[in-house]
């Protein structure tokens, strides 16, 4: 009888964590002893963490988490509601798929920039998924997201109704650990169901009154994929707070800014009012999007406490 095994935390509720093992089994486990004590301090178990679990010698059906393996990455954001602190959304990711809708709800490119900066700040590669692509023309969709495409982000146009883009996106997700992130109502759960029908995730319609989706995912859940890899459906976020990044680091989270930073006249240039700023000169020359620059200024001001 196996007494211990390793696996990945795929869900957590009320101190009980569901662990998916390397053998493809699922067990419910809780933290005990040292780990339980440390969980009230700096150590926070998260969905996506790799753990070792052991069977209780007295109760064969009871499992305990005995070790949390070192993380390779994490997707973290500020605690919601104005509280100070970090909330780890998912651990050990390879990439983030930032999902926005072409319409219903209307996309907000500046909000998209915020999601992209969070991925960059966490050292994660990001892909943009423009869902509900059948609701607008390709020309309209391209214009809405032109700034981010020009910044070099891979962009996928998808539709669960026409099947557009699903196969190509599936190829980029299989055998990797990915998280779908984005605002409410953009169709993340429906998209995951279309990519991998066996997941059977709950979905909800978009409210015509507010043009915002109702939350259907109540916490991050990691789903094993049929041919290897995991995909996480994260809750729809109305409030996305930056965490783990200083104001002076925001510029480096814009890929199109990075080649310019060393060309500024002053080493401590903050790219707002200084003479000889290569970033501002690129904006004026049309080489950097004014909209993306606006996002930079707003996010930097937010971290400086000026927003």
From Swiss-Prot:
One Pfam match, given by its short name, reads RsgA_GTPase
Q: How is the cofactor bound?
A: Binds 1 zinc ion per subunit.
Q: List each copy of the CP-type G domain by range.
A: 82-240
Which one GO biological process term can you cite for this protein?
A: ribosomal small subunit biogenesis
Which GO MF terms does the UniProt record name? GTP binding; GTPase activity; metal ion binding; rRNA binding
Report the principal subcellular site.
cytoplasm
Per UniProt, where does GTP bind?
A: 131-134, 182-190
Q: Where does Zn(2+) bind?
A: 264, 269, 271, 277
Cystine crosslinks: none
Q: Which cofactor does it need?
A: Zn(2+)
Q: What class of enzyme is it?
A: hydrolase
Quaternary structure and partners: Monomer. Associates with 30S ribosomal subunit, binds 16S rRNA.
Q: Cross-referenced NCBIfam families, in alphabetical order?
A: ribosome small subunit-dependent GTPase A
Tell me which family the UniProt entry assigns to this protein.
Belongs to the TRAFAC class YlqF/YawG GTPase family. RsgA subfamily.
Function comment: One of several proteins that assist in the late maturation steps of the functional core of the 30S ribosomal subunit. Helps release RbfA from mature subunits. May play a role in the assembly of ribosomal proteins into the subunit. Circularly permuted GTPase that catalyzes slow GTP hydrolysis, GTPase activity is stimulated by the 30S ribosomal subunit.
Name of the protein in question: Small ribosomal subunit biogenesis GTPase RsgA
Q: State the organism named in the record.
A: Gemmatimonas aurantiaca (strain DSM 14586 / JCM 11422 / NBRC 100505 / T-27)
Gene of this entry = rsgA
